[in-house]
Every structure is written in structure tokens, then in C-alpha cells.
Amino acid sequence: MKRFLITLGALLLATSTITAQISQADIDKAFKVMEDTEDTLAYHGDYSATVSLVVEKPGKPKENLQFKIFERTDDKLMTLVQLFPEADKGKGYLRNDDNIWSYDPISRKFTHTSIKEAIGDSDIKLDDVEQSKQKWRANYDVEAYEQGTLGKYPVHIITLKAKTSEPSYAKSKFYIRTDIPLVLKEEDFSGSDRLMRTILIPKYSKVPAGYVGTQILIRDELNKGEQTQQVISDLTFDSLPDKIFTKAYLEGLN
């Protein structure tokens, strides 16, 4: 009898595991929604923008940071230059495909770094500003897909699990409007399912090329009260000269 109960329990566990598996149709739908979020955004081809950050940490005064970003999304090229504060002016990052360097204008040296690196002293990482619809299928598996509501919006709720070392977090959950594929909320988790970070995007602006998340709030869930607000401005979609995506460009700014 005991052996029978153990065997029955194992069968029930296996059955529940199979039942809990996500269907291929939901996997395909989830990836399609994630890719649609990239298509809906205005960032296609060449663009530049000013990124202003307000960093809040308990017991410290607010810190203001400002960067200029240049990106050529089709070729995975990106240059990020710090404009403020004055003491850090000229610091930057350069991306060419999977190679990423940080630049220090004082030592005039480039250091190979990771897309997981935080920008300045903020809660924003380099991969947060990367625009690429190819990154979803290449770097994630779909763990769950469902529909629900967030505030007044019906949303897709998609949980992705990292399958490469590229993503900054082991798991991320996205809340995406069903009428227009815009991400309203993102929750990032550790490998043990601990909530590490929450991103809220309360404001989008419509421009001819698509939508732009002009106001973004990033909360550090490990350090309560610590958050970064990001504001996007001065967005342009003019063709950028090739030299902007070179080490010589960063070196020539100072």
C-alpha cells in the first residue's frame, strides 16, 4: 500500500507538471507580443535623445544625471555620453554588437564592460536602453502567459526566464497593454524568485515614428526608498554619422 501511494503521488506530480507547462501557442503569442512592443516604439534605425535621471536614495540628497544617447538599432551600435554633473562630463559607453566599453576621460582609457552595468549611480542598466526585437527569442524562454488588468488597462502578463547570460535578471514579468503593445510595468526577479526591481512607465508620447516612454520610474526593491526617475527629451531620428560609434568620437569630446 505504501509503495502504491508513493507511485500514485509521483504520477500525480508528473501530471500536474505536464498540466502546468505552457502551450506552444501561448509561447508564440508571448514572443509576438514582446516583439510588437519593440515595433510600437519609435526607436528604429538611427536616433538620438537626452536621458535625464533623478536618483533618490534614503538619507542622501537627490542626484541629477544627464546623458546623450546615440543608437543605430539595426547594427547594434550605441554611444552614451555623460553630460552632467560637470565632474563626470565626458564619461561614456560604446557598444559594437556584443562588445561594450566604458570610457574615462581623465585616464583616457577604455575598459571592456558588461551590458548589465548600471549607468552612473542609478538603478538603470545598459540593457534597459538597448532597443532590439531580436533579444527576446535569443535570450529568453517563456515561462508563463496570461491576461489580466493593471489599473484601468487590460494587459498581457508575460513571464520570461533568461536562458543566456545576457539579461541582467534571471526572470522578468511584463505587463503590456492589449490595445496598443506598450509595456506599463516590469518586475525583475533573482534566480530564487526574489523581487529585485520594479519598472513603471506611466507616460508615453506619440511621435511620427511611434511611441516613446518619456517618463519611467525604476524602484530598487532590495533597498527600500531607492529609486531612479528617467525622462527622455530632445528625441531625433536623423541619420547619424558613422564616427559617432567609434572610440575616437568619445576621445575627441574632451
Provide a role label for each language-model segment:
Residues 16-20:
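Sec/Tat signal peptide C-region and signal peptidase I cleavage site
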Residues 40-46, 206-210:
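Edge/loop elements at the starts and ends of beta-strands within beta-rich repeat scaffolds
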Residues 50-56, 83, 159-163, 218:
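Generic short beta-strand segments
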Residues 111, 131, 151-247:
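Gly/Pro-enriched, hydrophobic low-complexity segments
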Residues 45-79:
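N-terminal, post-signal-peptide region of Sec/Tat-exported proteins
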Residues 65-105, 112:
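Mid-chain, structured segments of secreted extracytoplasmic proteins
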Residues 21-36, 42-45, 52, 61, ...:
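Flexible, processing/modification-adjacent segments and terminal tails
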Residues 4-14:
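Sec-dependent N-terminal signal peptides
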